[in-house]
Each structure stands twice: as C-alpha cells, then as structure tokens.
Amino acid sequence: MYKGLLTLLLLFTCFARAQVVDTWQFANPQQQQQALNIASQLRCPQCQNQNLLESNAPVAVSMRHQVYSMVAEGKSEVEIIGWMTERYGDFVRYNPPLTGQTLVLWALPVVLLLLMALILWRVRAKR
C-alpha cells in the first residue's frame, strides 16, 4: 500500500514543475524567425524587465499570440510594432522613438555628461 502511494506521489511530483509550452504553427521558418525577433523586441507591460518571449504573464502570452497571428497574416515588423505601440504605448518598446515625451530620456545622459565635464574642467582650472 505504502509503495503504491509513494510511487503515485513521486509520479505526480515529477510533473509538478512542468510548464505550458507555447506552440504555434508557421507557414515557413522565416515567419517563425520574424515572429520570435519581433516578440524579443517588445517588453511585457506587467514584467518590467522581460520581453514577450521570456515572460509567462497572461498579458505577455496574449501579446505574443497577437504577434504570431499578425506575422501569419503577413504583416510587416513595422506594422506589428506600430500596432503594439499604439495599443500599449511606447513602454512596450525597448528602443522608444525620439518624441517630445522621450526627449528628456534621450538628452539627459548627454546633458549630465557635459555638466560633469564642465565641473571637472572648472575644478582643474582653479588649481
């Protein structure tokens, strides 16, 4: 009796860590590569530092399936990323475009670097 229960317990614990694998059929390997490339460029809105391929969050799974279906429909990378950006905002892009809202993000490092160079130059000039 105990051997049977122990066997069942071991059998069920072997599969306790199994995860759902996301499978999707593509017409050709190029479409699959395009879909994986696009999904790796988009950030999960729920998981701050994971792309759509790495995240298992429900929103990432939904977005990943949307990318796959749009690739299967023949949409281009620009169209898919544009659609995702329109729906979820610039946050989903790892490389946000240069706009009025993101100008501070792009310019701040340069301004800080120039400011530090100016401070160092003035300190050395006084010596």
UniProtKB/Swiss-Prot annotation:
This is Formate-dependent nitrite reductase complex subunit NrfF. InterPro entries: C-type_cytochrome_biogenesis, CcmH/CycL/Ccl2/NrfF_N, CcmH/CycL/NrfF/Ccl2_sf, For-dep_Cytc_NO2Rdtase_NrfF. The gene is nrfF. Residues 1-27 form the signal peptide. The keyword Calcium does not apply. Gene3D superfamilies: Cytochrome C biogenesis protein (1.10.8.640). Belongs to the CcmH/CycL/Ccl2/NrfF family. One of its GO terms (molecular function) is metal ion binding. Not required for the biosynthesis of any of the c-type cytochromes. Possible subunit of a heme lyase. Heme binds at residues 44, 47. One of its GO terms (cellular component) is plasma membrane. It holds the Pfam family CcmH. It comes from Escherichia coli O157:H7. It comes from the Bacteria. It is found in: Periplasm. Keywords: Heme, Iron, Metal-binding, Periplasm, Signal.
